[in-house]
């Protein structure tokens, strides 16, 4: 099983088909994954916030999720996340294939190597797998301006939304979208020698950019309207990448 999908807010299942559910025990705790067929490929799916959206961003066991996928043999992870736009050119309803991130989280479990008695410092110059990003971009050919080929994701601690002053700072730093779950997930994938790509579904303008107030209910509603587009893009990306057999440098990043 080469592919895993981690679904963000609104994406609690991927195909509507009946799927086998597995509970996996890892050294970092347990996680629950569904096994399904996508583009003819056996694929693992994890709902990041749990199927009932009971987990806040800082409560998610990112390490267990990634190591659970690793135990299942997953080498390539496609992860979705809702986000607010910081960039006037990125509209609600658009998708962004993430290329960089800025980390403003505060107290999460950031590494798989804690307590292992050895130093491990992975290179994050290009944090998202170039091969998987290319698969997403080629799969999205024809979407036009609604699919952005690059974007810097700002990750905040949450669960509160950002202040207008924070949003102004993130914009000045070059952030394009802002969310609460992309870090440390992307870092842990690199430590686990897994390819990882992030796809941001933009559901709203970040606070202070428009006059409208942000609410979780509005984010969920906006995400639900775009889920079929996200599902189709993920399936087409897997279809494009399934024939690729060469090992990626992502899979040789850390001494795990």
Mark where each language-model region is:
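Metabolite-binding pocket within alpha/beta catalytic cores that recognizes anionic/polar moieties
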Residues: 1-125
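Generic hydrophobic/aromatic pocket-lining and core-packing "Φ" positions
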Residues: 66, 167, 183-186
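Alpha-helix C-terminal capping segments
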Residues: 68-73, 89, 173, 187-195
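Generic secondary-structure signature for well-ordered alpha-helical cores
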Residues: 74, 100-103, 137-146, 159, ...
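Active-site rim beta-loop-alpha module in soluble metabolic enzymes
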Residues: 127-172
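Zn-dependent metallopeptidase/amidohydrolase metal-coordination segment
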Residues: 180-218
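His/Asp/Glu-rich mid-to-C-terminal helical/loop segments that flank catalytic regions of hydrolases
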Residues: 206-256
